[in-house]
Swiss-Prot record:
One of its GO terms (cellular component) is plasma membrane. It comes from Actinobacillus succinogenes (strain ATCC 55618 / DSM 22257 / CCUG 43843 / 130Z). InterPro entries: UPF0761_bac, Virul_fac_BrkB. Belongs to the UPF0761 family. It comes from the Bacteria. The chain crosses the membrane at residues 36-56, 93-113, 131-151, 173-193, 205-225, 237-257. This is UPF0761 membrane protein Asuc_0342. It is found in: Cell inner membrane. HAMAP family: UPF0761. It holds the Pfam family Virul_fac_BrkB. NCBIfam families: PRK01637.1, yihY_not_rbn.
């Protein structure tokens, strides 16, 4: 007997099945490892692209703060100093070394591509086409990110949002800008990366859930390590590394959960369309 909760129960059942089948916890761990290897090459490429566009000079500092805060919300200053040092060292590398760093950055994009296509159960792209897609993401991604942050910075500086016009809701609106940017970023990832046409509504729904978990998770993570700083007693000066690993693991898990939610919505819609088509065929046969 069907009730109002039957669709939700069916969705939950399929979601849990796919969560186990796709081994999202293991996938999140693999992406965390790939991110740790590729974070310096990726940031180096991003800032190199930014340096080619003078319009982004004023945004670079904001972008650094954005990246470091999201990669390691508990120790963004320390992580930022180390990564700045690594990036400075990378400028002394030869052409072969720079190419190797770019390859490592492309490998991270490949890992993300494989994980998301595995969730949607889509076939792999051809090698040349995959390289073209990855290179486009690596080159255009930072530009899109820079434009988004530039717009966010511009909006922040508007008198309306600074509250200079005595509009109290301005500050509240301003607080949603990072969340909206995160939501839009996840939506684009879910809509573009899988090797199939994705329903944009489903991608946005999954991205919304991922953005909520990501935002709340970051706040909860910062609260925990501030309230219970026992990790510093255990790891001492090395405390930044395990914290960064833990947050990266959680971040990728949130992103994969949102992707899985969008994929299940696509799967359910496909099943419903097939049922409707079957009913239409049966009705025609009866006539």
């Amino acid at each position: 007997m069907k009730t109002a909760f039957t669709p939700f129960a069916s969705f939950g059942k399929i979601f849990l099945q796919r969560f186990g089948q796709n081994k999202l916890l293991l996938e999140a761990g693999a992406l965390t490892y790939s991110t740790m290897l590729a974070i310096v090459p990726l940031i180096m490429v991003i800032f190199s692209i930014f340096s080619a566009f003078p319009i982004f000079n004023d945004v670079t500092g904001v972008l650094k703060e954005f990246i470091f805060t999201n990669f390691a919300p508990s120790a963004s200053d320390v992580v930022g100093q180390y990564i700045d040092q690594f990036v400075q060292n990378s400028k002394k590398m030869s052409a072969v070394g720079i190419i190797s760093l770019i390859v490592v950055a492309l490998m991270l994009i490949n890992s993300i591509d494989n994980s998301l296509n595995g969730i949607w159960r889509t076939p792999k792209r051809g090698t040349l086409f995959s390289f073209a897609v990855y290179w486009t993401i690596l080159t255009l991604g930072p530009i899109i990110m820079g434009v988004s942050i530039a717009i966010s910075t511009y909006v922040t500086n508007l008198s309306l949002f600074r509250g200079e016009l005595n509009l109290p809701f301005g500050i509240k609106l301003l607080g949603f800008v990072p969340f909206i940017l995160t939501w839009l970023s996840f939506t684009l990832i879910y809509a573009i990366v899988p090797n199939k046409k994705i329903n944009i509504k489903h991608a946005a729904a999954g991205a919304l859930v991922a953005a909520v978990f990501f935002t709340l998770g970051k706040k909860a993570f910062m609260w925990y390590i501030t309230t219970f700083p026992s990790y510093q007693l255990i790891y001492g000066a090395m405390a930044t590394l395990p914290l960064m690993l833990l947050w990266l693991q959680l971040s990728w898990l949130f992103i994969l959960l949102g992707a899985q939610l969008a994929a299940v919505l696509d799967e359910i819609q496909l099943e419903q369309n097939n049922e409707i088509h079957s009913e239409q065929v049966n009705n025609k046969d009866k006539k």
